[in-house]
Structure formats: C-alpha cells, structure tokens
C-alpha cells in the first residue's frame, strides 16, 4: 500500500507524538534531566495540537482501512491532546519530589496520548482494540508510579487485573461479530449486519460482550467498582488523565461505531444501554453524597457524567443532535475536570506527602488562596450544571435531546441525578468559604498562579465561564466536527 503526502498530512498529530516519544527516549538515554524531558514533551504535544490546522486542509480522508480523519476525529484528537498537556503540566511539580526515575512518566503519557489519537480516528475494530490497549497499558504504570505508596500500587494492580478481564470480553465480542459478519470495519459491519441479522443470538452475544468491555473502560454501572479506588490511589495528575483523555477517546470511538453499524437499532441493545445509563446516573450521584475524599467524589461523579452521555449514544442513530450533544458535553466535562483535578494537584505535596484529597484540606481555602478557591467554585458549579457555566450548556443539550427524541424516563433520570449532584458539589463549594482550622498546613506555593499548572487551571476556569455565557464558538466548532458517512 502506497501512502500519499495527503495521508501523511492527515496523520500529523499521531506522527508528531510518535516522534516525540522517540526524542524523549533518546534524551533520557543521553542524559537524565527532568526539566529538558518535560519541556520536550510539552513542545511535542503543542506541535501536535497546532498540526490539526494542517490536517483540516486535507479534508475527510481514509488514511488506511483502520483510520478515518475527518472533522469528528480532529475535534476529539484536540481534546485528548489538551488533556495530555494538562496532565504533563500538573505532573512536573509533583515529580520534582520523586526520588526515582522521573522522566519515564512523560514517555507513558505520550504513548497513552498516541492511543487516544488512534481511537479518535478509528474506523475499524482492529484500530479500536489497538487504541484501547495503547491507552490502557501505559496507565498501569502511571497509576502505580508512586509505587512506594501502598495505595498507588494497589490501585495499579486492581486496574491492571480488571482491565485485562475487560479486554478479554471486548476481544471475544469482536470475534463473535466477525464470525457472523465477515468484516471488522465499522462500515463493513453496517452493511453486513442487516436488520434481520441483528436479532441473531450470536450477534447479540457479541454486542453484549463488547458492551461489558467498553463499559469497564468508561466506568459504567455495573462495571465501575474500580473507579473510586483507582482515582484515590493514583497520583493527582494521573487521575486527571484517567478522568479526561481516556474517557473522551473511548467514548468518541464508541459513538462512531454505533453511528456506522446498525447495532443501536436493536431494541434489546437500546434497552440495555438505557438501563446502564439510569443505573450509572443514580449510583454515581448517590455514592458521591457520602464521600469525604475529593478524588473519590470526583470518581463517582465521573460515573454519573458518563451515564448522562450514554443518552446521546442511545439516540445517535435516530437523532442528529446526539453527536452535537456529546461534543459540547465532553468539552465542558474536560475543562471542568482539568480545573478540579488541577486544584487538587496544586494543593498536594510534591510526591513526598499525601495528596490534598480530604474535604477537610479545602475548608476555609478562600481566606488563604481566594483566587484558587474561586477557580474550584467555578469547576464545582460547572460539574453541577449551574447556569453561566459550560457544564450547564452540556446538561441543557442532553435534556433538549432527550425531550426531542422522546426518551422521557432517561431525561427524568438526568434531572433527578442533577438535583442529587447539586448537593455534594455545593457541599465542596461551601467548605471553601467556612472558617479555616488553625492547625491546617497548606502546601500550595504562594505564587501558584505563575506556575505552569496554575496557568492551565486559570485558563480552564476562564473557558468554563466564557463558553458558559457565550457558547456559540464551541457549538459552531462541534457542528463542523461531524463524521461524514
């Protein structure tokens, strides 16, 4: 197969991140220097983000049978790279206190980013599986990077064992689909699996097993049990990546799969996804109420947010607004999560001490760091879906789409879940403004706003507010980012 210059241009983000991996490897072999390797990583990711401008000039293109680069892929590649940039930025001060090899952290983030880019442009079950494994395997190392701390190692082992089991289900489900359809490409599956075939037991079994595998990766009920433990055990910068880049990339490819293949037309599949959505919304929000650990709380809240997004997946074949809803919601979720986890990272001791994850650590933060507490307030209000924030725009789109698609009980679950979520998000917000305990020692540097992590957090807060008040630029961008069949 001959690759044309246009195809190379379409693969620029993947090629640049791959080249950055090689450069960072050579740099580590030449000399271990934390600052140089972190800088090379950030430069590589920024170049990959800028290269999307040149990718857009090529237009929708099938690069190989495994990859399709169009507006949809470009939008989600951009979100994944932004999440990776934020992760690398938050990790730098955390790694400064790390006693062992620090530079490999950036290698793992870059390799996982390649997996996310591959997933966003995947057009084939083979690239779907490769992308998921490429994003999951580095996470085993990243979650357990603080391996001297028992909980980090425990979280890594938990995630590794359960992820391996989920991958087995996913692979077996793909094999069953291939046995019946004779094709692994999304379009080929769409042509092969006609309406009459979709109800065959083998097809439904294959789809069911794929839902199990993907449900684990997306922390959907009942495959979510690992989520709070892993979020709590992982270092704060890694939790950022886990909550954003991996979820966004996997959800993007699942949306494309359901759009191309008629699996979503099966009433049985739609019913299962609807039940999972309601269970995820209610379980995630109800479990978050009792949490006193901010990372566990955000872990449970991510289960609920993916439940809201499943409603777009249920309606993706029948409703044009579904893709737009997913894009707006995921953009809002990305910036809100980056800000929330960014504040946790800034509040945490560089490696040596525990992360600032207890709600008690945030009590009275306003009286010591008013701007940082204002940022955390904005992020909590956005995740709760309060008007004038980007999170509200996403929730509004979900409810509007649910109503127009006549998914009444799912829309009711969104409203109920949002009402429950309001309680625990406001609980965090209120604690920021209470009187501060005198005994509490804070590790946040006084010049936090001038650090790279502080700048990322402030930009996230500004975007959440500005796009919450005037969302038209984001909506226009999402409308351009539609996959062309």
From Swiss-Prot:
Coiled-coil ranges from the UniProt annotation: none
- What membrane topology term does the record carry? Multi-pass membrane protein
What is an example of a GO molecular function annotated in this UniProt entry?
NADH dehydrogenase (ubiquinone) activity
Report the EC code(s) recorded for this entry: 7.1.1.-
* Main location, first listed in the record: membrane
Q: Name one Pfam family in it.
A: Proton_antipo_M
> What residue intervals traverse the membrane?
10-30, 35-55, 75-95, 104-124, 125-145, 159-179, 203-223, 235-255, 271-291, 297-317, 327-347, 374-394, 408-427, 449-469
Top class in the EC scheme? translocase
Q: Where in the cell is it found?
A: Cell inner membrane
Q: Which GO terms describe its cellular component?
A: plasma membrane
Instruction: Tell me one GO biological process term.
Output: ATP synthesis coupled electron transport
Its recorded reaction(s) are: a quinone + NADH + 5 H(+)(in) = a quinol + NAD(+) + 4 H(+)(out)
The UniProt keywords, alphabetically, are: Cell inner membrane, Cell membrane, Membrane, NAD, Quinone, Translocase, Transmembrane, Transmembrane helix, Transport, Ubiquinone
Question: What PANTHER family does the annotation carry?
Answer: NADH DEHYDROGENASE (PTHR22773)
What's this protein's function?
Answer: NDH-1 shuttles electrons from NADH, via FMN and iron-sulfur (Fe-S) centers, to quinones in the respiratory chain. The immediate electron acceptor for the enzyme in this species is believed to be ubiquinone. Couples the redox reaction to proton translocation (for every two electrons transferred, four hydrogen ions are translocated across the cytoplasmic membrane), and thus conserves the redox energy in a proton gradient.
Note the subunit structure: NDH-1 is composed of 13 different subunits. Subunits NuoA, H, J, K, L, M, N constitute the membrane sector of the complex.
Describe the family membership recorded for this protein in Swiss-Prot or TrEMBL: Belongs to the complex I subunit 2 family.
Record protein name field: NADH-quinone oxidoreductase subunit N
The taxonomy runs: Bacteria, Pseudomonadati, Pseudomonadota, Gammaproteobacteria, Enterobacterales
């Amino acid at each position: 197969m001959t690759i044309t210059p246009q195809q190379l241009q379409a693969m620029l983000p993947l090629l640049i991140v791959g080249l950055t991996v090689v450069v960072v490897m050579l740099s580590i072999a030449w000399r271990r220097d934390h600052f140089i390797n972190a800088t090379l990583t950030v430069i590589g990711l920024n170049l990959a983000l800028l290269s999307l401008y040149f990718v857009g000039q090529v237009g929708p293109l099938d690069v190989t049978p495994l990859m399709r680069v169009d507006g949809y892929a470009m939008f989600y590649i951009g979100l994944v790279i932004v999440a990776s940039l934020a992760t690398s930025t938050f990790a730098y001060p955390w790694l400064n206190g790390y006693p062992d090899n620090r530079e490999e952290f950036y290698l793992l983030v870059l390799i996982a980013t390649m997996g996310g880019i591959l997933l966003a442009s995947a057009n084939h079950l083979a690239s779907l599986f490769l992308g998921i494994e490429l994003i999951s395997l580095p996470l085993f190392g990243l979650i357990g990077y603080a391996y001297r701390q028992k909980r980090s190692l425990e979280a890594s082992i938990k995630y590794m064992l359960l992820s391996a089991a989920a991958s087995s289900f996913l692979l077996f489900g793909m094999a069953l689909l291939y046995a019946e359809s004779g094709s692994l490409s999304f379009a080929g599956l769409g042509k092969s699996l006609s309406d009459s075939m979709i109800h065959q037991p083998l097809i439904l079994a294959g789809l069911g097993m794929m839902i199990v595998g993907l449900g684990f990766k997306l922390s959907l009920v009942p495959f979510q049990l690992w989520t709070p433990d892993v979020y709590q055990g992982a270092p704060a910068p890694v939790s950022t990546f886990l909550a954003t880049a991996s979820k966004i990339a996997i959800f993007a490819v699942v949306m494309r799969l359901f759009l191309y293949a008629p699996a979503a037309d099966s009433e049985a599949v739609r019913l299962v996804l609807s039940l999972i959505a309601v269970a995820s919304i209610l379980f995630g929000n109800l479990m978050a109420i009792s949490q006193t650990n901010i990372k566990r709380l955000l872990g449970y809240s991510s289960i609920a947010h993916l439940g809201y997004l499943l409603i777009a997946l249920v309606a993706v074949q029948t409703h044009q607004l579904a893709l737009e809803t997913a894009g707006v919601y995921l953009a809002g979720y990305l910036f809100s999560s980056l800000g929330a986890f960014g504040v946790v990272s800034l509040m945490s001791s560089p490696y040596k001490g525990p992360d600032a994850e207890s709600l008690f650590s945030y009590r009275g933060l306003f009286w010591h760091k008013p701007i940082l507490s204002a940022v955390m307030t904005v992020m909590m209000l956005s995740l709760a879906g309060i008007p004038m924030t980007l999170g509200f725009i996403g929730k509004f789109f979900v409810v509007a789409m649910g109503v127009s698609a006549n998914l009444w009980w799912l829309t009711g679950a969104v409203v109920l879940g949002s009402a429950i979520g309001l309680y625990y998000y406001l609980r965090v917000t209120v604690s920021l403004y209470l009187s501060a305990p005198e005994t509490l020692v804070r590790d946040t540097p006084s010049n936090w706003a001038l650090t790279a992590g502080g700048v990322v957090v402030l930009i996230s807060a500004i975007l959440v507010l500005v796009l919450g008040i005037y969302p038209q630029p984001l909506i226009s961008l999402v409308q351009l980012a539609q996959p062309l069949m």
